[in-house]
């Protein structure tokens, strides 16, 4: 059985960038403890000889051949841009130098 404390819940919430109201900490403590108890049960299951997998059903990508097609909408699209610099969209800077 896991021994989860209120401080453990606060730490997990902090790491996950969650602002948990103090009156919910006890509820989350119990829930997290039950989750970890379930994980302990799963760890005890004998999986010898069972192949590792990431999903129950195989997934494949459906692809199509790329086709280059001429279009006349370039200028129409550029005219709709809130900010434009020549033949390019101008976007706000998001990364610091």
Swiss-Prot record:
It holds the Pfam family GatC. InterPro entries: Asp/Glu-ADT_sf_sub_c, GatC. Keywords: ATP-binding, Ligase, Nucleotide-binding, Protein biosynthesis. It comes from the Bacteria. The keyword Nucleotide-binding applies. GO terms for molecular function: asparaginyl-tRNA synthase (glutamine-hydrolyzing) activity; ATP binding; glutaminyl-tRNA synthase (glutamine-hydrolyzing) activity. SUPFAM superfamilies: Glu-tRNAGln amidotransferase C subunit. Its EC number is 6.3.5.-. It catalyses: L-glutamyl-tRNA(Gln) + L-glutamine + ATP + H2O = L-glutaminyl-tRNA(Gln) + L-glutamate + ADP + phosphate + H(+); L-aspartyl-tRNA(Asn) + L-glutamine + ATP + H2O = L-asparaginyl-tRNA(Asn) + L-glutamate + ADP + phosphate + 2 H(+). GO terms for biological process: glutaminyl-tRNAGln biosynthesis via transamidation; regulation of translational fidelity; translation. Belongs to the GatC family. Heterotrimer of A, B and C subunits. Allows the formation of correctly charged Asn-tRNA(Asn) or Gln-tRNA(Gln) through the transamidation of misacylated Asp-tRNA(Asn) or Glu-tRNA(Gln) in organisms which lack either or both of asparaginyl-tRNA or glutaminyl-tRNA synthetases. The reaction takes place in the presence of glutamine and ATP through an activated phospho-Asp-tRNA(Asn) or phospho-Glu-tRNA(Gln). This is Aspartyl/glutamyl-tRNA(Asn/Gln) amidotransferase subunit C. It comes from Synechococcus sp. (strain WH7803).
